[in-house]
């Protein structure tokens, strides 16, 4: 795996997995704007969409996803040097009590007038205001373990965390040293 510097200043990175054509952030935004991919996804997950969000119209779900993706993409990619990424990313676990080394984090789209956002971007926190994006998903259930596509995102974030630890990377300084040696 390699890492792409999204902001150009080392504050936001995205994983590019060995078998991937692009990094995870750009892959997600491409996917969340692909009507055919979204139609297939929502057809396969219509029961979850209805159970949690009370939406049965796949076209509405597609439209909401594309709209929400554009807003989230603007927030993530239009980050000014003064912007605080800690306001965008939150701990993955809603029950976290203390910060941990290489903490698992999430960013989500904003609530619309119709419903909460189901878009998630997952990341690892290197230090205050510095993150590595590991993936993302359309989350239609209460927990990530309930569906294979969100469980896969948990697996990816843990895989990246393990990779960093195996390379002796426990913070931003270690990550920058690692990147500079490549």
Language model features with spans:
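An acidic, glycine-rich, mixed-charge low-complexity segment common to nucleic-acid enzymes
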Residues: 1-76, 83-109, 169, 175-176, ...
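Residue-level signature for short turns and capping positions that connect secondary-structure elements
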Residues: 20, 138-139
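Alpha-helix capping at helix-to-loop junctions
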Residues: 81, 128-129, 166
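Short Gly/Pro-enriched turn/cap motifs at secondary-structure boundaries
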Residues: 111-113
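Short, surface-exposed coil-to-beta transition loops
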Residues: 116-121
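Active-site beta-strand-loop-beta-strand hairpin of nuclease catalytic cores
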Residues: 125-133
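Short conserved catalytic/interaction loops centered on acidic-Pro-aromatic/His motifs
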Residues: 132-135, 142-143
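A recognition module on extended beta-rich or small alphabeta surfaces enriched in W/G with H and D/E
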Residues: 141-181
């Amino acid at each position: 795996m390699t890492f792409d510097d999204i902001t150009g200043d080392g504050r936001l990175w995205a994983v590019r997995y060995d078998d991937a054509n692009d990094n995870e952030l750009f892959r997600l935004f491409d996917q969340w704007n692909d009507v055919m991919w979204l139609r297939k996804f929502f057809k396969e997950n219509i029961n979850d969409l209805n159970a949690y969000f009370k939406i049965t119209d796949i076209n509405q779900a597609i439209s909401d996803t594309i709209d929400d993706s554009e807003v989230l993409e603007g927030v993530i990619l239009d980050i000014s040097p003064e912007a605080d990424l800690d306001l965008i990313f939150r701990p993955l676990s809603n029950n976290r009590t203390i910060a941990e080394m290489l903490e698992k984090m999430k960013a989500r789209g904003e609530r619309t007038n119709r419903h909460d956002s189901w878009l998630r971007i997952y990341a690892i926190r290197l230090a205050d205001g510095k993150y590595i994006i590991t993936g993302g998903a359309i989350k239609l259930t209460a927990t990530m373990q309930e569906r294979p596509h969100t469980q896969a995102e948990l697996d990816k974030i843990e895989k990246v965390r393990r990779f960093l630890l195996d390379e002796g990377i426990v913070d931003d300084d270690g990550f920058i040293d690692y990147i500079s040696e490549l």
